[in-house]
């Protein structure tokens, strides 16, 4: 889909740009442990500053359940933004009300302020019209750059667009371009690598990508339900009984479409699901009845490598093993390295696979690392995201 962006807006000079960012960053004892999402918003903020806008930033943080809670204050974000932008970013004590509006009206061109957490109001997640109107009084134009919240029809992502001219920021544009490009017209061969623990959370993505892919790699905990549906023994591995038929139908449809599906050919197993469990290699599709599948084996990795090295487009979403346990993270690490060394277009989306490329310092070797967890998933499922829909041409 084609969205209107900041480049399509005639003049920002002297105008208050109400910019919805995704500053939902991890905090440890009040300090930001990963500022990726803050840095992702900088290009839009800098662009608006250069054009004389008065920048009013708005975001949510955590789940404060519609109540003011200092634990979820955006103050640490304002401090980090001040460092990154090299200027004072004033933190306002609220996100609506006459005091806040007056503060925004007294801003000078190039000033940046941050409103307090919009989720301190229950009306935010209900997309309450009155709340959206009050929020819109802090701006003259609405810029949505919060791709990570684009799948939510909330007051600050959708509601304010009813009251202000609305455009997307550069992050929103980039996500739309890369994820949209994969769904519309991927260069071939196109390989989809889908991992994660549950079929239930990934089946819609698998079905959406099946007709577009040349190869689909299925790994992680959900692979065992697919293996079981093919008659292999999976021991004590994760099994979703209600998805066995769906997994079987998916594999049948793949065969009909001529799409190659790679399932684990061999396994790293353990006696139980524990980070201290001893890894054991099984050179077979079948897993002994007293063992749990924890990661993919060397033969599976070789098979994946063969398709990845010739791929022109790769989408990777979800880890291939129990990535959070070091002894069982090798499969995911190796796949991250393969994707990073591919010369084609590579897109990584979904919290755990993004964490993997960051952990192994490979993010700069990936064409596009998506910032949206749930939003990326829903986009790849082919759903229309409300936060993007309001920006369409």
Curated annotation (Swiss-Prot):
ATP binds at residues 202, 293, 324, 350-353. The keyword Protein transport does not apply. One of its GO terms (molecular function) is ADP binding. Its main location: cytoplasm. The keyword Cytoplasm applies. Pathway: Carbohydrate degradation; glycolysis; pyruvate from D-glyceraldehyde 3-phosphate: step 2/5. Its EC number is 2.7.2.3. Substrate binds at residues 22-24, 37, 60-63, 119, 152. One of its GO terms (cellular component) is cytosol. GO terms for biological process: gluconeogenesis; glycolytic process. Keywords: ATP-binding, Cytoplasm, Glycolysis, Kinase, Nucleotide-binding, Transferase. It catalyses: (2R)-3-phosphoglycerate + ATP = (2R)-3-phospho-glyceroyl phosphate + ADP. It is found in: Cytoplasm. Belongs to the phosphoglycerate kinase family. PANTHER family: PHOSPHOGLYCERATE KINASE, PHOSPHOGLYCERATE KINASE 1, CHLOROPLASTIC-RELATED. Monomer. This is Phosphoglycerate kinase. The gene is pgk.
